[in-house]
């Protein structure tokens, strides 16, 4: 299975840099079996069935992009930092520009209330130890940081105050992600209430999406790719809700690839169980899904692990046809783009 098998041509004009307004006005490509329909997210009320269960990732994106100053003698230099994940040894793993000029022991000052020491430096990242912890760190980070927009958006415009709302789901509660679970960005409170009134169930899980979600696949044989690890949790109550839905014949539908990867990790033994820890599950064609019946997700990058995941769910040829339709019909791609609802089998 070659990396080139997951390539496709995407016109740059289809890369969304702002979301649809309102959120539910985004377009929705409904692919059920061999059928494709062009709909909108607001139509989900008539698409989902009573007894369906949506699995939502309730992680909260932190303002992980920081701009600071490194002082060496009389000289000052600007440093751009993106937090990646908490480090096992304490502090945060982070990417920095310019990384090569930073040295262990140096201090980067981000604001009057927030500084960090370079504790360790690797080839591609470093470990920072901040001078604040707990609630004091959260408050200082909120003041000094900016939303960590994906590279394909950040290359086209700078983050602004609108992203603080746009790049956060309406049910975000547990801070720790440095990228949004973007399929969930399409939901607003009225849509959630309308779905609940139709007896569609909701289960919340937590997967703190890491910066590794944007890393390219660098091997041609995709089966040898190693995934980045991300921390997640499926509580006992969440596992019980999902198991009850399966037992009752309902469909379990993760909203986003992060929710899907998490519940499949929690069902590695065959049945969904409470689970907590780091997952590096890599789903590509040939994978046997254990609890997932369908998936709502945005449109993904060429040659990405997420494109491999949806190909595992729907089949490679089917995904090629779906993405060809999306490009020909001007669907908007990636984090702020439109959505798809993928239902295998039909």
UniProtKB/Swiss-Prot annotation:
An example of a GO molecular function for this protein is: S-adenosylmethionine:tRNA ribosyltransferase-isomerase activity
Subcellular location, record wording: Cytoplasm
Gene Ontology BP annotations: queuosine biosynthetic process; tRNA wobble guanine modification
Alphabetical list of InterPro entries matching this protein: QueA, QueA_dom1, QueA_dom2, QueA_sf
For this UniProt record, the keywords arranged alphabetically read as follows: Cytoplasm, Queuosine biosynthesis, S-adenosyl-L-methionine, Transferase
Gene Ontology CC, one term: cytoplasm
Q: In which pathway does it act?
A: tRNA modification; tRNA-queuosine biosynthesis
Its catalytic activity? 7-aminomethyl-7-carbaguanosine(34) in tRNA + S-adenosyl-L-methionine = epoxyqueuosine(34) in tRNA + adenine + L-methionine + 2 H(+)
Can you tell which superkingdom this protein's organism belongs to?
Bacteria
A Pfam family matched in the record? Queuosine_synth
EC number(s) on file: 2.4.99.17
- Description of how the protein assembles with itself and partners: Monomer.
Q: So what family is this one in?
A: Belongs to the QueA family.
Q: What does this protein do?
A: Transfers and isomerizes the ribose moiety from AdoMet to the 7-aminomethyl group of 7-deazaguanine (preQ1-tRNA) to give epoxyqueuosine (oQ-tRNA).
Q: What is this protein called?
A: S-adenosylmethionine:tRNA ribosyltransferase-isomerase
């Amino acid at each position: 299975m070659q990396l080139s098998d997951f390539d496709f041509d995407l016109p740059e004009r289809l890369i969304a840099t702002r979301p649809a307004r309102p959120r539910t006005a985004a377009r929705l490509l409904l692919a059920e079996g061999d059928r494709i329909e062009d709909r909108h997210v607001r139509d989900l009320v008539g698409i989902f069935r009573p007894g369906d269960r949506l699995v939502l990732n309730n992680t909260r994106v932190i303002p992980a992009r920081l701009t600071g100053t490194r002082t060496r003698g009389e000289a000052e230099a600007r440093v751009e930092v993106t937090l990646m994940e908490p480090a096992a040894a304490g502090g945060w793993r982070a990417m920095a520009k310019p990384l090569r000029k930073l040295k262990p022991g140096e201090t980067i000052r981000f604001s009057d209330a927030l500084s960090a020491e370079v504790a360790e430096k690797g080839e591609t990242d470093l470990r920072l130890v901040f001078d604040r912890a707990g609630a004091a760190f959260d408050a200082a980070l909120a003041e000094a940081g900016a939303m960590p927009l994906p590279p394909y958006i950040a290359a086209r415009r700078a983050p602004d105050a609108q992203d603080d709302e746009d790049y956060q789901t309406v049910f975000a509660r547990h801070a720790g992600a440095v990228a949004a679970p973007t399929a969930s960005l399409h939901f607003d409170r009225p849509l959630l209430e309308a779905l609940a009134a139709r007896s569609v169930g909701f289960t919340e899980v937590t997967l703190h999406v890491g910066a590794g979600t944007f890393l390219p696949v660098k091997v041609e044989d995709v089966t040898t790719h190693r995934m980045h690890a991300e921390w997640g949790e499926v509580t006992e109550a969440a596992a019980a809700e999902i198991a009850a839905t399966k037992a009752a014949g309902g469909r379990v539908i993760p909203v986003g690839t992060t929710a899907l990867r998490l519940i499949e990790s929690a069902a590695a033994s065959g049945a969904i169980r409470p689970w907590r820890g780091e997952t590096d599950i890599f789903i590509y064609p040939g994978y046997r899904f254990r609890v997932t019946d369908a998936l709502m997700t945005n449109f993904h990058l060429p040659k990405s692990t997420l494109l491999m995941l949806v190909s595992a769910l729907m089949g490679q040829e089917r995904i090629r046809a779906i993405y060809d339709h999306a490009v020909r019909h001007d669907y908007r791609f990636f984090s702020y783009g439109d959505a798809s609802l993928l239902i295998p089998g039909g």
